[in-house]
């Protein structure tokens, strides 16, 4: 399997030397010899061959969707050839194919596909599981990226459900983000588990891919208890714990620091993600005098009506930003809004968009399905407010920037922001979010080694009321001095915003209570 097939199946074959290292760690970590070893996606069979060397008395089973791989693995393991079967894990449960007797010890090992459904669909792959809402996401969450589920994560959760009432150890290679999500699901659903570990390794060295990866090792057991902690080790030095994940009060923490102030709660403001259009070569522009220039280097005379300043993650380098040199065409003020009005209001812009209609039609994401031509996502009334306090989702150190120009500024979908009509409110919020209590709290709940440490889910956990209660006026004044501005922030402004936040927090709590009362009625 090579070329596009490798991409479609998310297929990274595990080198034999590494499969043996994985089996060695599993054997040293768990003293019970498995009766049955299963590789759900066996590929060329390296894991099963390695497992046979370390667990000589175990019965081996291997499955793969590829007949080519099944044949290759059968040839390597002739003694278990009848147990190496062509099977689609997500269409035919392994429990239907293997007789797991009561009390048997099972080991599931392997390296499931490292791909998301959107990555596969972009290259027209059909190797997708039937989409079920395992995490009970809302319709909006499903459309805006949480539905961009990782195939590996889906398979692990599926296998946990399949083997829930057995004594089964999982030793799976996966992305670190997948391992964290699996731990959260196991802890949240109180699945009995005797141990939970991650062994981080260099995927570039092993697979030549730039991904934060790990060996996920845990055991579900009928005799175990519910865990709320996951220890993280270095694969090359597996005896030392390098960090710990905790699941406490229904929340995940990357680092529980006793010295940091717990600001966990629900933000009384709504964090928003920037706009999404998936057509940067057409929609994103630079400007030279009165001429716009797109990424294809076309020089364009366009009306300014639907063109707005644009900020990306790489632009957020300071606590205030008011000089912006890139632009974006914004075709809608709310999702699904008809775009035909552009033809009348800005005919040059309309003609330009239509000249590139094929590029819009190539967009694969489900959010554009049944939408008007040139549709976007992540737009609403909040997009057009003059003042925004934004953060890049990518940086390790959280930096919040106050962004404003004469015209409303758009952010791309790598950024998250709060929007305001009032400069004073935005300015104060920027200072508060850059304060030490908020910064320390964020680094205790964010996963700094992930590609996108800061997400809406993380930011929405900042309780602004608690932040005010733990941040004095003088501390915010100190932050202001680093801006090298004339003193602007006053005690009256501080008290005014503090009162506003307390009122918003109260209303937010009342609304949430009303929602749950209605839901339970």
Predicted features and spans:
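Signature of N6-adenine DNA methyltransferases within the class I
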Residues: 7-21, 25, 41-60, 64-71, ...
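Short, ligand-facing micro-motifs at secondary-structure edges
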Residues: 200, 392-410, 439-449
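C-terminal accessory domains/tails appended to large, multi-domain proteins
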Residues: 419, 427-443, 477
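Conserved acidic residues
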Residues: 35, 106-107, 388
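A short beta-sheet element
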Residues: 398-431
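Glycine-anchored helix-breaking recognition loops at helix->coil/strand junctions
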Residues: 200-201, 414, 436-464
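C-terminal substrate-recognition regions of SAM-dependent nucleic acid methyltransferases
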Residues: 205-207, 214-390, 453-495, 499, ...
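Class I S-adenosyl-L-methionine
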Residues: 1-76, 80, 93-96, 152, ...
